[in-house]
Regions:
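Terminal transmembrane helical anchor/hairpin motif
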Residues: 13-36, 159-236
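Functionally important transmembrane alpha-helices
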Residues: 140-171
Length: 236
């Protein structure tokens, strides 16, 4: 439900307000591209990050119930592997949400097309590659949220820090240091796609450097800190 409900919530307004995609105020973008971009704005800015925050905290909380952490650490497996395995679970959950997001987009586009008598459905290759890119960009963010959930054992504080870090992302993508803030990565890529669909609105070129090496560094550092924390738990 945590994976499904946010997706449904985001696409219902897109169906209800589908007619607004024709009123683009002189912006050179087609209604079907506008439908796609507007529908994914809420997902990339808030829902994907918020889902990751809640999923990581819930996953760490399973360790606390019924001495789960003691049972887990008693296994003949290194804490590093345990930590990375749990992070992989987060990634797998994210992949499931991505697949459901694609399905929901097409369902919404078909319904909107019937209501407005206009074809809002985009090419499957275009949709799948773009959505996959958005979710791949969320991996460094997932690593940071996983690190927070491991380091901050109080759930309310961990969730609070995670959700608070989401809000500035829409502003940070317009600064020169956006690449250092992983919570802004998916929204940045969506805006790049917006720039391609509507010439002159936003940059249509991805600044791979220094983004790519920095994103890898952030992911590695976050996972290292998470694994170290897991190691201290075993020593206790």
């Amino acid at each position: 439900l945590i994976l499904i409900i946010p997706v449904i919530i985001m696409w219902i307004p897109s169906i209800v307000n589908a007619s607004m995609n024709f009123d683009v105020h002189d912006i050179p973008i087609t209604p079907e591209n506008n439908f796609f971009i507007q529908g994914f704005m809420g997902m990339t800015w808030f829902m994907i990050p918020a889902t990751l925050v809640i999923a990581t905290v819930l996953l760490t909380q399973t360790e606390q119930s019924q001495n789960g952490i003691l049972k887990m650490l008693s296994l003949p497996v290194s804490t590093i592997r345990l930590c990375l395995a749990k992070f992989i679970v987060i990634i797998l959950l994210t992949i499931l949400q991505m697949l459901f997001c694609i399905i929901t987009y097409y369902a919404s586009a078909i319904i909107a097309s019937q209501l407005q008598n206009y074809n809002f459905v985009l090419n499957p290759w275009f949709v799948c590659t773009n959505v996959l890119t958005l979710y791949l960009a969320a991996i460094p963010m997932a690593a940071v949220f996983w690190m927070l959930s491991v380091l901050v054992k109080t759930p309310i504080f961990s969730i609070g820090l995670g959700l608070a870090s989401i809000v500035p992302s829409v502003l940070i993508i317009n600064t020169k240091i956006w690449f250092a803030y992983p919570m802004s990565y998916p929204f940045y890529l969506l805006m790049i796609q917006y720039g391609k669909a509507a010439t002159g609105i936003y940059s249509s070129q991805i600044d791979w450097f220094p983004w790519f090496p920095v994103s890898i560094l952030i992911t590695i550092l976050a996972l290292i800190l998470s694994c170290i924390r897991f190691g201290t738990l075993k020593k206790r």
